[in-house]
Amino acid sequence: MSDEVFSTTLAYTKSPKVTKRTTFQDELIRAITARSARQRSSEYSDDFDSDEIVSLGDFSDTSADENSVNKKMNDFHISDDEEKNPSKLLFLKTNKSNGNITKDEPVCAIKNEEEMAPDGCEDIVVKSFSESQNKDEEFEKDKIKMKPKPRILSIKSTSSAENNSLDTDDHFKPSPRPRSMLKKKSHMEEKDGLEDKETALSEELELHSAPSSLPTPNGIQLEAEKKAFSENLDPEDSCLTSLASSSLKQILGDSFSPGSEGNASGKDPNEEITENHNSLKSDENKENSFSADHVTTAVEKSKESQVTADDLEEEKAKAELIMDDDRTVDPLLSKSQSILISTSATASSKKTIEDRNIKNKKSTNNRASSASARLMTSEFLKKSSSKRRTPSTTTSSHYLGTLKVLDQKPSQKQSIEPDRADNIRAAVYQEWLEKKNVYLHEMHRIKRIESENLRIQNEQKKAAKREEALASFEAWKAMKEKEAKKIAAKKRLEEKNKKKTEEENAARKGEALQAFEKWKEKKMEYLKEKNRKEREYERAKKQKEEETVAEKKKDNLTAVEKWNEKKEAFFKQKEKEKINEKRKEELKRAEKKDKDKQAINEYEKWLENKEKQERIERKQKKRHSFLESEALPPWSPPSRTVFAKVF
């Protein structure tokens, strides 16, 4: 039976209509069931297998289905009844074909799937088919009894173990869907995964940044201060204040160290007061100079970037010199200085806070004030150092010996005691000093007079040079005036000559124009006469040509008339000749007719004679039949008739 069902050639011998219909219907049912089983197996394999198998199955579905259908449908031969009545499909002889269909269908499906799937996916496809074989057979048996309809996706009923496994994996296993939906879902899942990763990263960053952003009271104060300063300050001013505050702290810490409390020297109270007053002034000026210097350096760093480390070193050196000078001050003074330093530091910090609101215009004023402060501090430093470094009388050194006495002027006590050698020496020395001073003053006066004389001489020389220069300038001016007059006279002469030449040229142009006008008139008259003569000549020529043309026309007309006459005569002759020829032809025709009549008559006569002779011959043959046996002559001419001898 299986051979009969799956035979490629249809059984036309038994019952043609029934066999055609049953074989066609059975094969059609087989193709439909195989397709449905293949689609179900591919869907479940897509659900349980990886995405790679899905992508491989996409390429092989349509081609494999078409190949399987084409293989089975190649040898079908549809009858005329089926073409006329396609709706009357009767499922006859189904009992014979059902068992064979169920037996052979899994093999065909497995073969088609092996053709579709790649080598690496064969085991997975075979497993999926083996799981779905039993259910496919039951479904096919039910479907063969019914009419074929469009496929509806049915939910697969699994075993208890499979149900348990599915219950555990319900949260991640999707329901079976078409391939296009699976592809779209995979793309959407990738996008959702990327979005989940981004949200997780953002949450982690927020968690990490949360503890760092917890507010503290110190932080709140700092932020409030920063906001207040940032509202009042430009970015350049903020740089200035930071640099100024740091530099002030360093330099003030270096300059006002506790080592400044040195040993006090033995001085008078007035000198100590003056020294304290000067030192306090110098310290205040120094602080102002430091603050102004560092403000200017900060501005220059932020704007021009031209302040170097040498300025800082010089300022440190100045501070060290000041500290060396201040080591001789009393401890009370050092305490007062420390108090003043603290107050000045607070004042300077307040000043820096106020200066933060000031912009670039006040930085120039700060530079000027810093320069003046530096000059003032240098003067105060010089004064204080000169006063402090003056040695007292009590502590003066005695290494000069008795030469110091010479510098002292003789007092009343010394004048009372003139015998002492030191006093004599001092008096002599003082007289010599007075004479020397007088001499020096005289020499200085002489030098001053000489310098004045030299100055006067130089002034006189300069005046003489100026007078000479003025005289030379006047002479040069007079020479230039003469030359200018000469040049002006030359220019006037040149202008006169130019005017004369222009007038002469104008007169020549006028004469030339008059001559040209005359020549033009003559030329026009000549051309008019020439044109008139040419016109007359052309007229005469035209008349001659017209006459010649008229003569030629006359000659032509006469020639044409003669030719026409000749032509008419020639045509008349031709007509006459044609008439003569016609007559001759008619005569010939008449002669021919006569000859034909004569020939016909002669022919008729000849025929009559011939008939007569034939009759005579026939009669003679009948009469003399016995003479036929006699030998004929060896040759007889065809035109001549040989008569037999009559006995």
Curated annotation (Swiss-Prot):
The keyword Electron transport does not apply. Residues 184-210, 298-328, 443-628 form a coiled coil. GO terms for biological process: mitotic cytokinesis; mitotic spindle assembly; regulation of mitotic centrosome separation; regulation of mitotic cytokinesis; regulation of mitotic spindle organization. This is Microtubule-associated protein 9. Residues 155-166, 210-219, 239-249 have a biased composition (Polar residues). Residues 133-145, 187-200, 268-287 have a biased composition (Basic and acidic residues). It comes from Homo sapiens. The keyword Cell cycle applies. The gene is MAP9. It is found in: Cytoplasm; Cytoplasm, Cytoskeleton; Cytoplasm, Cytoskeleton, Spindle. Keywords: Acetylation, Cell cycle, Cell division, Coiled coil, Cytoplasm, Cytoskeleton, Microtubule, Mitosis, Phosphoprotein. It comes from the Eukaryota. Its main location: cytoplasm. One of its GO terms (molecular function) is microtubule binding. Residues 365-374 have a biased composition (Low complexity).
